[in-house]
From Swiss-Prot:
Keyword Chloroplast: no
Family the entry assigns: Belongs to the PDCD5 family.
Listed GO CC annotations: cytosol
Gene3D superfamilies, alphabetized: PDCD5-like (1.10.8.140)
Pfam family membership, one: dsDNA_bind
Cross-referenced InterPro entries: DNA_bind_arc (IPR022889), PDCD5-like (IPR002836), PDCD5-like_sf (IPR036883)
Keyword Cytoplasm: no
GO-annotated molecular function: DNA binding
Name assigned to this protein: DNA-binding protein Mboo_1886
Record keywords, A-Z: DNA-binding
Organism from which the protein derives: Methanoregula boonei (strain DSM 21154 / JCM 14090 / 6A8)
């Protein structure tokens, strides 16, 4: 191996390491952005939900995280648009959940 080959290998390796460092930094920034967004959503939910409604939403999050996220987004939109005049009670949250829940299919099996 000549000096030219070694320097070329070093340059490629250095470029590869710099690329990896840049990727790690971008990934870390994305994680931090998601954490900030999550904390902002939690702050809004604390302002618009009563404790029992918040507890119900947390329970739903354990079983259906996607559905809970959709409900949270809906609540944040309502809060930001100014449509919420008071905190949402557990009964009001139940009504909202019924409206947002996908329609269940009812199957009936008849035997001959």
């Amino acid at each position: 191996m000549g000096d030219d080959e070694l320097s070329e290998i070093r340059k490629r390796r250095m470029a590869q390491l710099q690329q990896q460092a840049g990727d790690q930094q971008a990934m870390q920034e994305e994680v931090e952005r998601q954490q900030r967004l999550k904390s902002q959503i939690q702050m809004v939910l604390m302002q618009v939900l009563e404790p029992d409604a918040r507890e119900r939403l947390n329970t739903i999050r354990l079983t259906k995280p996607d559905f809970a996220s959709a409900v949270e987004q809906q609540l944040v939109m309502l809060a930001q648009s100014g449509r919420l005049r008071q905190k949402i009670t557990d009964a009001q949250l139940k009504d909202l959940l019924r409206q947002l829940a996908p329609a269940k299919r009812d199957y009936s099996i008849t035997r001959k």
